[in-house]
Amino acid sequence: LQLDAPLSMSLGQDDAECFVQRIAGNDWRLKNVGVENLTIDSEYDTTNPKDENHAWEGVYINKVKDGWVRMVNFRHLAGSAVVTQRDASRITVEDCISQAPVSEIGGYRRRTFLCMGEQCLFQRCYSEQGMHDFVAGLCAAGPNAFVQCDGYESLGYSGAVGPWCTGLLFDNVNIDGNDIKFCNLGLEGYGIGWNTANSLAYQCTAAGIFADSIPDGSNNHVFACWAQFNGSGDFQQCNNHAKPWSRFASLLEKRLGRDVSSQCRVLERERNNVSNNPTYDVAQKMVEEARKPRITMQMWIADSARFTASVSPG
C-alpha cells in the first residue's frame, strides 16, 4: 500500500475500527485548473459599513485536484477570499491580498483564507481585518501549510476554526494584534474542542500562541516563535530566531534534491547581533540598513509578477 501523503494522525485499533477503501470509478475532479491575475472587488452599500447583502466568497474551490490561485487581489468581501473545500486537494494559493472586508464582526465571517481540503499550500498571502485570517476548518484532513502569511489588524485568532484539523504547518506566519491557537478550545464556536493535533508553528509571531498536548500522546509544537506562550504543548527556542528560515522551503529542497528558491521565494530577514556597544563597522552597517524601507509582505507579493512567468503552469 503506497500513500501519496503522510498521515497527519495515528490510526490505531484501540481508538476505532480502521480500514482502507478504494474509491470506485475514475477520479471525477477537475485537474490542472487555476485562477490568476485578477482583482475581485465586491460592490456594497457604502452607507452601511456592516453591509452583508453582497459577495461573500472570492474564489471557492471544490472537486478540484492540482489547482491554484495566484496573484489575485480581493476587496470588500464579507466571507472568505479563498476557500478550499473538502473535495479539494493539492491546491496552491499564493501571492494573494485581501483588504477592506465589509461585514458584521461575528462568526462565520472574514475567515479570509480558509482551508477544508488536504495537501493545500497557502504561501505569501496578506489579510487585513480578518476575523480568522489563516485557518483550517472542520476536520480538514491535512497536511496543510500556511507559509509566509501576514495578517494585519486581526480581529480573531488564526489556526483552526473547526475540530480536529490535524497536520497544520504555520511557517513564518505573522498575526498582528491577535493569536495563533493549536489547542483545546472547549465550547468555543459551538464546541470545537481540540482544534488540531500534530501541528507546528515555526518562526511565527503573534500576540499569543496557544499550544496543547493531546491526552493520546499527540503533540502540537511551537519552535522559534515570538509571542506570549500558553499551554501544555512542546515549546522550544521561544523568542529566538532559528535556521533554516523556512522549514517548509528546507524540507521541499531536501525532498526534491534541488534549489527551490524560485518556487518558495522566502523573504528572509537579516539577523543582526543585538549589542549595546557595537563596533564602528557594525554600527555603520546598521545605520545604512535603517535608511532602507522595510520590505513588507505586500511589497514582496507585488514583486512576484517578475517571477511568475518562469514558474506558472502551462
Model regions and ranges:
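Short helix/loop capping segments that flank catalytic or ligand/cofactor-binding pockets
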Residues: L11-G12, E43-N48, V69-R70, A81, ...
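Small/polar beta-strand repeat architecture
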Residues: L1-T47
